[in-house]
Amino acid sequence: MKTKILSVVVMFLLGTMNLLAQSKTEKFKVFGNCGMCEKTIEKAALSVDGVKSADWNKETKMIEVTFSESKTNMDKVHIAIAKVGYDTEMHKAKDEVYNKLPGCCKYDRPE
């Protein structure tokens, strides 16, 4: 009986550890300026299936993203953010999308 209980507890703990191991948090730079940028950038990141949280800091221009490695990857997050007009370290937004951003959201684009 003790062996069965111990087996169930061990399986539960291993399952929990496996779920925790699948979550990963990464930071990367996203260009933007204001609170409106923050909302749009975070919403774009959160639209990616598997992203659990996204927090962009307008002072540092860094976003912290927690995601499930079994459902997505960072490239998909970069692409989603670039599609709404914001350049990231890996992907540049299309000029026509960037040009549609409100004036307060336009930033000096890196070459």
Label each residue range with its predicted role.
Residues 23-31, 98:
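Immediate flanking context of iron-sulfur cluster ligation sites
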Residues 1-25:
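Bacterial Sec-dependent N-terminal signal peptides
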Residues 68-74:
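Helix N-cap motif at beta-to-alpha junctions
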Residues 99-111:
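Short, low-order "capping/linker" segments at domain edges
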Residues 58-66, 96-102:
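Surface-exposed aromatic
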Residues 85-97:
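Conserved short beta-strand edge segments in small beta-sheet-based binding/regulatory domains
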Residues 41-43, 76-84:
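Short amphipathic alpha-helices in soluble, non-transmembrane regions
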Residues 29-64:
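N-terminal targeting signals for Sec/Tat export/insertion, comprising classic cleavable signal peptides
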